Structures are given as structure tokens and as C-alpha cells.
Amino acid sequence: LTLMAFVTVIGFDDIMYNFQNQGMTVITSWILMLFLYVIPYSLMVGHLGSVFNHEGGGLSSWIRGTKGEFLGYFTAWTYWAASVPYVVDSANSVVVGFGWAFTGSNKFQDTMSNASFTFWTFVTFVIFIFIQHHLKNSMEILSTIGGGMMFIMTILFVLLAFFGLAKSGGHMATQPMTWHTIIPKFDLKYWSTVGMLIYAVNGCELIAPYVTQMKNPRREFPKAMIALSVMTAFLTIFGSFALGIYFNAYHLPNDLKMNGSYYAFSALGKQFGVGNLFMYIYAWTSVLYMCALLAVLLDAMTRMLISDTGEKYMPKFLRKTNKDGLPINGYLLTCGLSAFIML
């Protein structure tokens, strides 16, 4: 469950996005965010998940149980609709990841027309719905493999980056590197980027619908949230510093948000004399990770919408599930709306 939550909450690309926005000052921002948001929010989710451990709607079940059925229904629809663009973005990232995994560069997506990119993104949706429908426990398998590999690759990047820093005599691409480099200037520009930090580490409530599948949810679910907080702290703080070793935070590439993760592992491999080996390993890791994220998002947001919403608010055909308890018609609704957004 911790790896499923890790998949929805944080990834290497989330670190890259905010490094692009704030540079090395993002280290301080991550520390503040951990204590002011990540840890308290994870503990709240852990507590609510352990209390409402027999309901399968997650956030919508919590609101329904505390504020009434209508607000529970309103929460379910609102959260589902707000998550659809994120699902589309995750499917896009799967296509980008395959491009890097096969070509070792960004040529695949750069030479593709918008229509072709949209087509392959839609194909990704169809494949995932087919897999979810026919392969039992596919989401759990993808989450374990994708989340585990991404965490391992992050640890590998951080450890090798610090080893490379010592090997090079302390030379960093970010110069000058002083205490002032990591202290943000709390102006309007800074505050306008804080929302991206929250967006990056948000999402642990998505795995709440699976609390009903745990053997001892009252004890195990809070533990999963605590483990998630520790993993997030390591990835955000040390990962951001490691990026400053290979990228000059004062002069960053324009396409860092889309391709920065691949540039980082390529630079790491070249420093250690293995060429693009690390980059290719990361590319396939990213594909598995984004596939896991897409699977969890499709399933969790649909369950949140359908699993514990009052019958008078939810049409019967949407509440229909297959023999494994999967809301297939809900998947199709999500896929249809995603296709509309892409078009």
C-alpha cells in the first residue's frame, strides 16, 4: 500500500518540475512543505482511513460519514472531475517514456504530430482498461514494481550523485553554492510556485479506497502513511540537492520539466563512464512507474466516485461492477471524458 501511495504522491518528475520553478531554494521549500503539509496531511489521511475502514469510497466516504450523503456525492464527483486532467497527463507521460526508452532521446515526441500523440495517448487508455478488466491484481503488481523501481532509482541517483561530488572534489554545476543559494526570497514569484509543491506531494488520499482490502486497516494504514512521509522526505530534499550537482540552477534548459529526468541520468552515466546506461534503465523504470500511476488513478478515482455514493445520486449502470469488483462502466466514463479533453 505504501508503494501504491508513493506512486500517486511523488516521483522524480515532480522533483524536476519544482527544481525548474525554484532552483536550489526548493530544498528549503520542501523542508517547510514536509512539516507544514505532507506529515500532518498523511497522518490525517491515516487516521480517517483507519476509522472508516469498512467503506470503499475513500475521501467521499469520509465526507459522507461526517457531513451527510449529498456532500459525499458532491465530493465524489468534484474529486473525480478534477483528477481527469491528471490522468490525461499521466497517459501522455507514458508515451513520452516509451519514446525515450526506445530512442534514447526526445526525437520521438518532438517529431510526432499532435494528432498522433493524442492517438497514442488514447490507445494507452484502451490498453489499460483492457488489462484492468482481464488481468487480476494488475494494479497491485504494477504499483509494486513501478513504485519500487522508481524509489530504488532515486536512491541510486542520490547516492551516485554524492559519490560523484566527492570524486570531483566537490564541484557542482550550480555556482556559486552557498547557504544563501538555498534560502528563498519570499516574494510574489515564490508564492506563485508554492501551489506546484502542494500539487506534487498531494494524492495520498487516493489509496484510501483500498483500506477495505487490508487485513488490519486500523493499525496498518497509518503505518503506510508514515512510511510514505519518510520516503517523500528523502526523495524531495536529497533528490533536489543532487539535481544541483548536474544542473546549474541559475541557467536551466527550457525543456527540463519534460525531459530533465532523462538528462539527469544521462549526465550521471557519463560521469561514471557507462554512457546512457542509467538513462535507459530510468526510461523503462519511468514507463513502469507512469503505467502504475495511470492504473492507480483510473481505478482509485473511479472507486471514489462510485463505490460509496448514495444510490439516489448515482445511476445504476455506473455502479455496475464485474466479477472482480471493478467498476468497468466507470472506467469507460473516465476514458470517454479524457478523450474529450485530449481532442
Model regions: which residues?
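TM-loop-TM module centered on a large, flexible mid-protein loop between adjacent transmembrane helices
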Residues: 60-62, 68, 227-294, 314-343
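Hydrophobic alpha-helical transmembrane segments of multi-pass membrane proteins
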Residues: 32-36, 77-85, 126-130, 190-198, ...
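Transmembrane alpha-helical segments of multi-pass small-molecule transport proteins
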Residues: 1-6, 103-137, 151-160, 197-202, ...
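Helix-loop-helix junctions that connect adjacent transmembrane segments
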Residues: 28, 111-115, 144-280
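Transmembrane helix-boundary motif of multi-pass solute transporters/channels
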Residues: 1-96, 206-207, 214, 225
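Helix-loop-helix connectors at the membrane interface of multi-pass transporters/channels
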Residues: 61-64, 91-117, 153, 214-217, ...
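Membrane-water interface regions at transmembrane-helix termini and the short interhelical loops
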Residues: 17, 21, 50, 123-149, ...
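Flexible loop linkers connecting adjacent transmembrane helices
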Residues: 23-27, 45-73, 98-109, 133-136, ...
